[in-house]
UniProtKB/Swiss-Prot annotation:
Residues 599-648, 805-1098 are annotated as: Disordered. Its main location: cytoplasm. Residues 324-503 form the PCI domain. Residues 905-914 have a biased composition (Polar residues). Belongs to the eIF-3 subunit A family. This is Eukaryotic translation initiation factor 3 subunit A. Residues 1080-1098 have a biased composition (Low complexity). Component of the eukaryotic translation initiation factor 3 (eIF-3) complex. GO terms for molecular function: mRNA binding; translation initiation factor activity. GO terms for cellular component: eukaryotic 43S preinitiation complex; eukaryotic 48S preinitiation complex; eukaryotic translation initiation factor 3 complex, eIF3e; eukaryotic translation initiation factor 3 complex, eIF3m; multi-eIF complex. The lineage of its organism: Eukaryota, Metazoa, Ecdysozoa, Nematoda, Chromadorea.
Length: 1098
């Protein structure tokens, strides 16, 4: 933890030296580290550099890597704008110390192992036991003890320094120097894992440079990829990386490093073609050829060497004859060692249908060699012949080229190649011997297949002397497998047969089978083979003819030479003048080109100087602006500090307030100190207002939300259950399959156990049967005697049981006859009892059509028992004027509460359209005699039956489609909140014809149902059963069918027949019970049936 006081850098350095002298290096390191991290003095001085050097020495001595990293990053921020050279000095000194300590640790480890104790005394038991248990040598154990910590420290130092200096153009040279030292460290100590991490780290740094290349305000000192110096440094570092990977034999990392080098060269070439030197390309192709050779890719190895030879050939000044011969020989040997079909996909790729992957890999490798297309052996040979590689190669390579490419001698080619290969002595050429032997063997085998249909195995061994029997047989099989030749080994005849056959691997599956004259090589018979043989025969015959006519041809040649001499003498002067003119013209062209080139160079140098001057001026301007900006920020920071201090004082004074105490408890003291007091009050006020509004809104919505909460939970539960169901359905097949597999395994195991048990019991059974037979034979006489006795006893038992069975059947028949007689007598007595009871019932007074009287607790009339006590009659409702109920004023709601949708949707009861009378065809639908009855309807059945000659007050609408109607349809005050709608009744007609009575039809027109009631239960929301056929859908549910009659003239109800006069007192109790203060129990919406159930009684 940093101290609460500050020391000057000079005092801190002096204090650290004093602590070091007394042996307190850790305290000295803390003192110097606190000084580096202090924010008081951010201006660099030479004392800071001395402090950093001492700090690095202490970090190395104490192995404090994290403190060194922190101090270096702090020092970078201090010296970035002022003195970057000081940072480089500190970093170099730090790495030098770490490397020196690592070397000392290595020497110390070796010396400790070399120290030998008493020669007369052998190894102590502890040392022997340690060697056996660890399984490592003494040097390895000592390296892990002494050297490993310093290796880890040095690796962390390299990595931290690279992270410190990345993407900084001012220290780019030091960055690449440290990178190369890191590669040397990995190579010297064979740190393969660290080498891979280092390569990944450098790739990540390059990606970051490319990412932030054009990003604004990221880093003013970032590396620019347009700089040739930066690109050259990166390219050289990648070449060192590739060389290190090859030396460490990390071929996978070598291939990745080759890709990195190729990417850097492409990037440099895009920026400036002159950036990449030819020597860099030569080194790159040389390393890449080695990587391809180690990977076993002979084709791209030869292509890389050919590219290297082309670069060498362009460098005419530094390319001597010896170097040209050496490079050409190597290129030609590498090309000749390419096996057949190396550019084609393997059989495995064709069988797995991944040929596109092979093509993509070939294209990628071709890009690494800067080739437009994938190379082939034929293409490489043609390119080598074009640039004169065979002519420039050595004699050995020339002889091999002639033998393998332009020679048809199947019986001698392998021996001739072997004799040439024996002359190769150079180590870099000996690596191609094995490949050349394989190519020569395949070549000989192909040429032999042209001449012979079958050849003995002994002769094949003499023709191809490179291999023993097993290797030669493998060669023949591989050649046939890869469609190079069509051959089969006949071990019975001890020979090799050539040609297509179903028994060969190549027979019947190759695309070349349909081609005429398949041979696998253009030197074999076929169309192309015949042409080549004819050409060779013509050449040899022409040579023979020239030898026979040599004298004649000599005279013709001499005459031709004399003609050339005569022509030369005649045109000599003209040709000499033409040659001189051409030479002078070339010299003038060269002088003009050099002059233009010098002028362009001077112009470029002038422009470069101007750009550098402009850059320096821009840099100075930027530094001035940066200094001004720093000064402005410093003053602004001071002002902000003063304001914060004033604010803290104010907050400290107001902390005793209750509001502030609550805020402190809620947000914490630290956050409270950074807040504005007025802002705190404003936030507190807004929060209280928001809480109050939220509480009010919650109270208002609580009533709505409460009813839908359970429904929402059910909906969510349905979704969850559906998801679980789908999951179980998806899992069911797999579980079933697992269960079936386990069951089958169990059944198989059980079956095996049963089979095993059955075999055991079968053996026991056979032994038992044998034993039984033996016993039978031994006791035959005794057995026969016992059998005869048993038969006698059996006959006696059979006779006794037959007698018992006959007696039992006789008793059963007697009992059955007695039971039938008793049942017939009981049936007769029951019939007599029923007849007697029928006579008694007929003599009783009939009850009529009325049913049994309903119990008091189930009847509203029975509950109101005033009429039983001879109490004065009460009116069920106050008398009202005879007017349509829709003409009255709307009734005000009796309480204020939010109305629901069911309360406001009254279109089905308060409709403005008057109700029509149904058609006469459905006249029975409006009777109340055929519907379901209540239990007490039999009491007033004769009194309340409607007459058929009654007519409704809307008979003028009989010509239109009818619908049922009740008084509730015309009453506007039956429901609270209903909208007042006035209906104007049409004029009544006197002589309106009455409808003819028709029998009701089962398939007549449907009853009218208002839209608001469709798909809903009747009663406006209450769960009630639908009305029966013939019942009015708008009738109150507390009245039985047939109870209500149509209104008479004037809008009043007509009194039913056999009733007392309308104006007189009535002793009939109300069927709906006395009126209560609460809503009617039979209403659809708590008061829907009041008007309809009471007006008719007036």
């Amino acid at each position: 933890m940093a101290p609460n006081y500050f020391q000057k850098p000079e005092a801190a350095l002096k204090r650290a030296e004093e602590l070091i002298q007394v042996g307190k290096e850790s305290d000295a390191l803390d003192t110097l580290h606190d000084t580096i991290k202090a924010r008081r003095h951010k201006q660099w001085t030479t004392v800071h550099e001395q402090i950093m050097i001492k700090h690095m020495e202490l970090c190395v001595d104490l192995k404090k890597q994290h403190l060194a990293k922190d101090a270096l990053f702090q020092y970078k921020a201090l010296t970035q704008q002022i003195n970057v050279k000081s940072l480089e000095t500190v970093v170099e000194h730090f790495l030098k110390l770490a490397e020196q300590r690592t070397e000392d640790a290595q020497k110390q480890s070796i010396e400790k192992v070399e120290e030998i104790g008493d020669l007369d005394q052998g190894d102590v038991p502890e040392r022997l036991l340690l060697a056996v248990v660890s399984g490592a040598a003494a040097q390895d154990r000592m390296d892990r003890t002494v050297l490993a910590p310093w290796l880890r420290f040095l690796w962390d130092s390299y990595r931290n320094c690279l992270e410190l200096l990345r993407n900084n153009a001012q220290v780019e040279q030091l960055y690449h120097t440290i990178s190369r030292h890191s590669f040397s460290f990995c190579l010297r100590y064979q740190r393969r894992t660290e080498f891979r991490k280092l390569c990944d780290l450098l790739r990540m740094h390059l990606n970051q440079i490319q990412k932030h290349q054009y990003a604004p305000n990221v880093n003013s000192f970032r590396v620019k990829l347009t700089s040739p110096e930066s690109l050259t440094l990166m390219q050289d570092t990648r070449l060192v990386q590739l060389d290190t990977a090859i030396q460490m034999e990390l071929w996978q990392e070598a291939y990745k490093s080759a890709e990195d080098v190729h990417g850097m060269m492409q990037l440099s070439k895009d920026k400036d073609k002159r950036t990449v030197k030819p020597s860099s390309y030569v080194n790159y192709y040389d390393k890449l050829a080695l990587v391809f050779w180690k990977a076993g890719n002979r084709l791209f190895h030869a292509a890389a060497l050919l590219q290297k030879f082309i670069i060498y050939k362009d460098m005419k000044k530094s390319f001597t004859q010896e170097e040209a011969q050496e490079q050409a020989t190597r290129v030609l040997l590498a090309t000749l060692s390419i096996p057949e079909g190396s550019d084609l996909p393997s059989d495995l790729s064709r069988n797995l249908d991944i040929e596109e992957q092979h093509v993509a890999n070939m294209r990628l490798l071709s890009n690494l060699l800067r080739l437009p297309i994938a190379p082939t052996k034929v293409g490489i040979l043609k390119e080598a012949a074009r640039i004169g590689v065979p002519e420039a190669a050595g004699q050995v390579a020339k002889d091999l080229f002639k033998l393998l490419e332009s020679n048809f001698s199947p019986l001698r080619v392998a021996k001739d190649v072997q004799s040439v290969l024996d002359t190769i002595t150079r180590p870099d050429h000996l690596q191609y011997v094995e490949s050349l032997q394989a190519v020569a063997a395949v070549k000989a085998l192909k040429q032999v297949s042209v001449i012979y249909e079958a050849i003995s195995w002994e002769r094949i061994r003499k023709i191809i002397p490179f291999y023993h029997d097993l290797a030669l047989e493998r060669l023949v099989v591989e050649a046939s497998k890869h469609r190079i030749v069509k051959a089969q080994l006949d071990h019975r005849a001890d020979c090799v047969r050539f040609g297509s056959s179903d028994a060969t691997l190549a027979g019947g599956v190759d695309e070349y089978d349909n081609n005429e004259g398949f041979t696998g090589d253009d030197t074999q018979l076929g169309v192309e083979g015949v042409r080549n043989h004819l050409e060779a025969m013509y050449t040899r015959l022409r040579v023979l003819v020239e030898g026979l006519d040599s004298e004649k041809r000599r005279k013709e040649i001499v005459k031709k030479i004399e003609n050339h001499v005569t022509s030369y003498e005649k045109n000599r002067v003209t040709e000499i003048e033409r040659i001189h003119r051409r030479k002078k013209m070339l010299e003038n062209y060269k002088e003009n080109w050099e002059r233009v080139k010098a002028e362009k160079a001077a112009t470029a140098a002038t422009e470069q100087a101007k750009r550098e001057e402009a850059a320096r001026a821009e840099e100075m301007k930027r530094l001035d602006e940066q200094n001004k900006e720093s000064e402005r920020k410093r003053k602004q920071a001071e002002q902000e500090e003063i304001q914060k201090k004033i604010k803290r004082d104010q907050l400290h004074k107001m902390q005793q307030n209750v509001i502030y105490q609550a805020i402190i408890k809620e947000k914490g003291l630290e956050q409270f100190r950074d807040m504005d007091p007025e802002q705190v009050l404003r936030e507190q006020r807004e929060r209280l207002d928001k809480e109050r509004a939220e509480t009010q809104r919650r109270l208002q919505q609580q009533e709505k939300k409460f009813d839908h909460h359970i429904r929402a939970l059910h909906l969510e539960e349905m979704n969850e259950r559906r998801a679980v169901m789908h999951m179980r359905l998806n899992e069911a097949p797999r579980l079933h399959e697992e269960y079936e597999n386990k069951r089958i395994e169990k059944e198989i195991a059980a079956h095996e156990n049963h089979v095993k048990l059955w075999s055991m019991w079968d053996q026991v059974r056979e032994a038992t049967l044998d034993w039984v037979e033996t016993v039978k034979v031994e006791n035959q006489e005794n057995l026969e005697k016992k059998i005869s006795d048993w038969e006698v006893k059996l006959e006696a038992v059979r006779n006794s049981r037959l007698a018992e069975r006959a007696e039992k059947r006789k008793k059963e028949r007697k009992e059955a006859a007695m039971q039938a007689k008793i049942a017939e007598e009981r049936k007769r007595r029951e019939e007599e009892e029923r007849a007697r009871q029928a006579v008694i019932d007929s003599q009783r007074r009939p009850h009529g059509e009325r049913g049994q009287r309903r119990e008091m607790e189930n009847s509203a009339a029975m509950q109101d028992s005033d009429w039983r006590r001879n109490a004065p009659p009460r009116d069920s409702m106050p008398q009202r004027e005879p007017r349509p109920m829709r003409d009255g004023p709307p009734r005000e709601p009796f309480r204020e509460m939010p109305s629901s949708k069911a309360d406001t949707d009254s279109s089905w009861r308060s409709s403005a359209q008057p109700t029509r009378k149904p058609d006469d065809r459905r006249s029975d639908d409006f009777r109340r005699d055929d519907g379901p009855r209540r239990s007490d309807d039999h009491r007033r059945n004769d009194e309340f039956r409607r007459s058929d000659d009654f007519r409704r007050n809307d008979d003028f609408r009989r010509d239109g489609p009818p619908r049922p109607m009740s008084k509730a349809d015309t009453d506007q005050k039956w429901e609270r909140g209903a909208v007042t709608k006035t209906v104007v009744s049409p004029p009544k007609t006197e002589n309106q014809p009455a409808p003819a009575a028709e029998a009701p039809k089962a398939d007549g027109p449907r009853r009218f149902i208002p839209p608001a009631l469709r798909n809903k239960p009747a009663g406006g929301g209450d769960e009630q059963p639908a009305p029966q056929r013939g019942a009015n859908v708008t009738s109150p549910p507390d009245r039985a069918p047939g109870l209500r009659g149509p209104p008479g003239p004037g809008g009043r109800d007509l009194p039913p027949r056999d009733l007392p006069p309308r104006d007189g007192p009535r002793d009939i109790p109300r069927r709906d019970g006395p009126r209560r203060d609460g809503p009617n129990r039979n209403s659809g919406a708590n008061n829907a049936g009041n008007a309809d159930s009471a007006n008719w009684r007036r």
